[in-house]
Structure formats: structure tokens, C-alpha cells
């Protein structure tokens, strides 16, 4: 058989040659400034990767083999989960059975503490096959042991095979402490009780690491991962110190992680997570390497969901679910697109469910095992994320561990700082949400929708906790400040008109008018674009005839010296005058009294707040 190499006539090109060619094409623009992506995650991303960039050992890694970078099993079947806030048992039961009949094979019930009674569980789970459907329960920490006892008793009464029932009891006392400010120093005893109660159900996990709430609060990817690892290690250490074998503890921990819209980095995050967790558990010397597997449930982010242009939320959650599926997680929840402003409708829940079913039955992602394996880019991202997360993890451990950091407010402050950094970037459109701070729907109204309130209303007190007034985790969506701005405009009862006075150079006036329309429409203003005016006088006359509240001069930098001052003087105090751009003659224009300029460096949020104030909104 002839094994002639393809392209043997072409000599190999080195990485240095590629870089030199890029530098040449940049024509003097600094390579590092233009081509290196300086991420917020603590590492840089190169413009290209080659075989020599692959981390050592990854070429021999296999799915289902320690340290499980490529997945916990030699297949990629994940569970499609949907969450139900259980109130009325019959209603929640009907919802669950309808979802199961239409492709969902994992249900998560959120149950208030006051509902934990012997009568409630049979009514909630009536007619649901606990052996074929994964059942997960998020119960108030103060009632979790009682609930678990009642659940096991129910399974026995209904003659389910306890070796086959599968699911989780989401006991996460540190997570509760983080959001409530109530310290729980006695959680180890609860873990011991839960492990004992669920010992008869080997496919149940009773300890949860809910790092998805960090994602929802604005944590960076490496930050969420590092904290999740330290969080899990805290439970692992406490339980083994209490005498529970490491294999038992590790097999009882489930990680509930968030998924941001950073597609490739999220794929890499989950791969890095499995690798690092396997190596952490290995340090405890388990009897079986299978105890080192990190079981991950992935939840699409709420941090980037928006009130306005809410259908775009479907697109966000679709790419997020896709990245988690490619990464090989065990189960996925897609948040319904309307969860920002209402209890999700049946339509929204159906779409959320179908988003995953499309990935399975139409895209066939469940038929491909770790397609990212061997990718120069994703393998390098995996290594970079792992290295940065490990560094942060070790810093937490050296400072006394995760629980100590939570009690002192260190974790909450760090995540809040990250969220604030991201909001600052969002205000300047360095971070973008389509339909909110960029490319808004000009004619959209809220239709009475307002952000849904969040909070614990479990209906009971948390056993083993004490009030400390500790710092709580601030969970705030990225879009909220812009949404409030737009809602304020609506509530004012009038919609300010922003008129584009386009004049001069055709390309520049169109570009600046488009920029200005997008800029001002994010506050809910009515924007009036124009093809162009022959003279300043013509443009000003049209603006005043339109009863414009704001007039934006759109032209080229060179022509502003000619047009801006006459236009400003003609407008006078009849409207707010803005120049679109940052022309060289800015100082001269300011001396003439022009104070409002908008450009790509503007803080969009603060500029719009100032305009609202001037408009009396």
C-alpha cells in the first residue's frame, strides 16, 4: 500500500514563521496589542495554536480514564433536567409527569421546609418511576434529614429497587451560609446523618456544591472553578475527619455549576474541573479511582439573562447548553427565557426542554465523546484554566480553607468585585448583551414586565445556624442597571426623541448615526435617523419641527470644525446638543459651550443617566 504523504512537496512552516507573517501583515501595529487576547481570567490567549502547544500527556488521554479530563465515561449521554418549584403537590406532580412524557429524564424539585411532611412526598411523586427518572431535591437545610428519611421510606413502601433509584439531595450548608449570612458550624453531623440515610441508595448523592450561584453573581470562569474545588474539598475534608471513608464522601458530592456564554472557555472549564477534582480526591488516597470522578450538573447562567429582547435569552442558553454537552457533563438545566420577569410559562419551559432535545436528537452531540479532545486551542485553554484555578484554590487552602473564607466574607467580596468589574465593562460596552447595551429593539416596551425578585422563603428556620450579620453574596444580573434606566424612561410617561442631524461625508455620517441610534435607544428613547441634510440650517429646522429633545450631530471629524458650532448655536436651549465622535477640534468645541460627546470610549450607562437627569426623568 502506497503511504505517500500529502503535500510532501511543501516544507513545514514554523510557528516563528507564522508569527513573522502576521507581524508583517499588521503593518506596524504591535503584535501583542492586536493579536493577544488578554482575558479577565488571569491568562492570555494566543492568536493561533499548534501541535507543540499541546499539554504534555493529553495525546494519550481517554474518556473514562483517570484524571477524567475527557469525561467520566466512554460515552456522552447526559440527562435533560428541568426544575420545578414545588408548591401544591398535585400541580408539581402533573408538571413533572408532563415533562417526563416529553423527553425530560431528570427533575429537580425545590421544596419549602414547611412542605416536608409524610403526606407531601407520596402526592408529589405519585406515578413517577424513580428508577428510570433522576429525581433531585433542593430542600431547606433545616429539614433535609427529615426529608431524606421520608423519601427512603416512600421508596421502600412503593417497592422501588433502592439500588436503581437515582438522584440527589442538595445539602449545601456553606452555600446557604453564603447567601443568608447565617453561619453553620454543625453541618458535619448532618452530612453523617445523610450519608447513613442514603447508604442504601448508591446512585443518590446527598452533598451539593452549588457554585452556579457564583456564576450568577458575576464570578469569572477560573474564579467559579477555584471556589467550587475549594468548596468541595471543604466538605471532603470535614467528612473524612469525622470518620466517613473518602470513597463514600466523594461519591456523595455533586457539583452544580453555571455555564456562561463564553463558549470555548466553558468547554475547557468543565474539562479542567474534572482533572483538578480527580487530583484533589487522589490526595485522600481512595480505594478506587472511580471515587475521583467529578459529577457535574450544569445550569445555564442567569447573570446574562435580560428583561428586554428576552427571546435572545434562548440563543444565549442554546450556546451555553451546547458547550456543556460537548464538555461531557452529567446533566443540564436550560433556564427558560422568561425566568427574568415571571414564573416561566408552559411555552418557555417547553422551548427550554426542546433546546436540549435538539442537541441530542438533531445535532447528535450525545453520539460524540469529547470532540474537543486533541484540539490545540481547547486543550491549551483547558491547561490554562486549570493552572489559574489551581493557583486560586491553593491560595484559599493556605488561608484556612473555603468555609473560613466564606465566614470572613472573602469569597463574597471577591465575587462582588468581579461582578462590579464586569458591570463597569458592560457600561462601556466592552462586555455586550445584544438587545440591552448594544443593538436594542428600538420599539420594544416592557409590557409591564419587571425583574422577578429572588430570595429564600423556605418557610422554616435553619437548624444549626446562628445570626452573624455576615456578608452575603450579591446576586445581580449584568443587565439590571440598563434595564432600570429603560424602565425609568417608560415610567416617566413620555419617550424622549433623539434626532440624528446627519451632514457631510456620507460614510461617516451614516456610521455615526447608526452608532448614536444604538447608543441612545438603549435608554428607551425614540431615535429619528435621517438620510442627510445639505446644510446645517436645513437639519436644525427639521430637528425642531420634529420636537426633538436631543439633537445628535453626525458627520466626519474633519467637518465638525465647520458644522458643530453653527448647529449648536442654532439649537440653543431648545434641545440637548450632542456631537457623535471625538474630533481633534473637541477643545475648540468645548470652548464654544458644547459639552456633550458620545463615542466608543464613552461610559454609555453614566452618559444616559446624565441625559435622563437633564430630561427630568
Can you say where each PLM-predicted feature lies in the sequence?
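Intrinsic disorder at enzyme termini
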Residues: 1-16, 34-37, 43-68, 330, ...
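A glycine-rich phosphate-binding loop feature that marks nucleotide/adenosyl-phosphate handling sites
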Residues: 36-44, 170-174, 210-216, 251-260, ...
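Conserved, mostly hydrophobic/aromatic
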Residues: 42, 103, 159, 277, ...
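ATP-dependent carboxylate/acyl-activation modules
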Residues: 454-455, 459-528, 541, 590-591, ...
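Mobile "lid/hinge" segments at catalytic clefts and subdomain interfaces of large enzymes
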Residues: 202-239, 315-393
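Short glycine/threonine-rich loop-to-helix capping motif typified by GTGT followed
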Residues: 219-225, 260-272, 301-314, 342-352, ...
Amino acid at each position: 500500500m502506497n503511504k505517500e504523504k500529502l503535500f510532501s512537496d511543501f516544507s513545514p512552516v514554523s510557528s516563528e514563521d507564522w508569527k513573522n507573517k502576521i507581524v508583517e501583515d499588521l503593518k506596524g501595529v504591535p503584535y501583542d496589542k492586536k493579536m493577544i487576547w488578554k482575558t479577565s481570567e488571569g491568562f492570555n490567549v494566543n492568536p493561533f495554536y499548534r501541535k507543540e502547544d499541546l499539554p504534555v500527556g493529553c495525546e494519550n488521554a481517554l474518556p473514562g480514564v483517570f484524571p477524567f479530563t475527557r469525561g467520566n465515561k466512554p460515552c456522552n449521554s447526559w440527562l435533560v433536567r428541568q426544575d420545578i418549584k414545588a408548591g401544591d403537590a398535585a400541580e408539581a406532580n402533573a408538571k413533572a409527569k408532563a415533562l417526563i412524557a416529553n423527553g425530560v429524564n431528570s427533575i429537580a424539585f425545590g421544596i419549602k421546609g414547611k412542605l416536608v411532611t409524610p403526606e407531601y412526598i407520596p402526592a408529589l411523586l405519585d406515578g413517577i418511576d424513580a428508577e428510570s427518572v433522576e429525581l433531585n431535591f433542593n430542600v431547606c437545610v433545616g429539614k433535609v434529614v427529615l426529608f431524606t428519611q421520608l423519601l427512603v421510606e416512600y421508596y421502600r413502601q412503593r417497592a422501588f429497587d433502592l439500588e436503581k433509584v437515582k438522584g440527589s439531595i442538595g445539602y449545601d450548608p456553606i452555600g446557604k451560609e453564603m447567601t443568608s449570612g447565617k453561619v453553620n458550624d454543625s453541618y458535619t453531623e448532618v452530612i453523617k446523618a445523610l450519608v447513613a440515610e442514603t447508604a442504601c441508595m448508591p446512585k443518590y448523592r446527598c452533598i451539593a456544591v452549588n457554585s452556579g450561584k457564583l456564576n450568577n453573581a458575576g464570578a469569572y470562569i477560573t474564579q467559579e472553578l477555584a471556589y467550587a474545588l475549594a468548596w468541595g474539598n471543604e466538605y471532603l475534608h470535614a467528612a473524612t475527619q469525622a470518620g466517613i471513608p473518602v470513597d463514600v464522601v466523594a461519591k456523595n458530592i455533586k457539583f452544580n455549576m453555571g455555564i456562561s456564554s463564553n463558549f470555548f472557555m466553558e468547554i475547557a472549564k468543565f474539562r479542567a474541573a474534572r482533572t483538578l477534582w480527580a487530583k484533589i480526591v487522589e490526595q485522600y488516597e481512595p480505594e478506587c479511582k472511580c471515587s475521583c470522578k467529578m459529577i457535574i450538573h450544569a445550569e445555564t447562567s442567569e447573570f446574562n439573562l435580560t428583561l428586554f429582547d428576552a427571546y435572545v435569552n434562548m440563543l444565549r442558553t442554546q450556546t451555553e447548553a451546547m458547550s456543556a454537552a460537548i464538555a461531557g457533563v452529567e446533566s443540564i438545566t436550560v433556564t427558560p427565557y422568561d425566568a427574568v420577569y415571571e414564573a416561566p410559562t408552559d411555552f418557555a419551559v417547553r422551548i427550554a426542554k426542546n433546546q436540549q432535545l435538539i442537541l441530542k436528537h438533531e445535532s447528535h452531540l450525545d453520539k460524540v465523546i469529547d470532540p474537543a479532545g486533541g484540539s490545540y486551542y481547547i486543550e491549551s485553554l483547558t491547561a490554562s484554566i486549570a493552572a489559574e484555578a489551581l493557583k486560586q484554590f491553593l491560595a484559599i487552602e493556605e488561608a484556612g480553607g473555603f468555609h473560613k473564607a466564606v465566614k470572613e466574607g472573602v469569597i463574597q467580596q471577591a465575587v462582588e468585585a468581579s461582578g462590579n468589574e464586569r458591570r463597569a465593562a458592560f457600561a462601556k460596552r466592552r462586555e455586550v448583551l445584544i438587545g440591552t447595551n448594544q443593538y436594542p429593539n428600538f420599539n420594544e416596551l416592557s409590557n409591564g414586565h419587571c425583574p422577578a425578585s429572588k430570595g429564600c422563603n423556605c418557610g422554616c428556620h435553619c437548624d444549626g445556624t446562628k445570626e452573624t450579620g455576615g456578608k452575603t453574596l450579591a446576586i445581580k444580573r449584568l443587565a439590571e442597571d440598563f434595564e432600570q434606566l429603560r424602565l425609568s424612561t417608560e415610567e416617566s410617561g413620555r419617550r424622549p426623541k433623539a434626532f440624528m442631524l446627519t451632514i457631510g461625508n456620507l460614510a461617516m455620517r451614516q456610521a455615526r448615526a447608526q452608532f448614536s441610534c444604538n447608543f441612545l435607544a438603549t435608554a428607551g428613547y425614540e431615535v429619528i435617523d435621517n438620510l442627510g441634510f445639505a446644510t446645517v440650517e436645513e437639519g436644525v429646522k427639521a430637528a425642531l419641527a420634529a420636537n426633538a429633545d436631543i439633537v445628535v450631530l453626525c458627520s466626519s471629524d474633519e467637518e465638525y470644525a465647520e458644522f458643530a458650532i453653527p448647529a449648536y448655536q442654532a439649537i440653543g436651549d431648545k434641545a440637548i446638543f450632542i456631537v457623535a465622535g471625538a474630533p481633534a477640534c473637541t477643545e475648540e468645541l468645548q470652548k464654544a459651550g458644547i459639552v456633550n460627546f458620545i463615542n466608543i470610549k464613552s461610559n454609555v450607562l453614566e452618559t444616559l443617566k446624565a441625559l435622563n437627569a437633564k430630561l427630568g426623568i
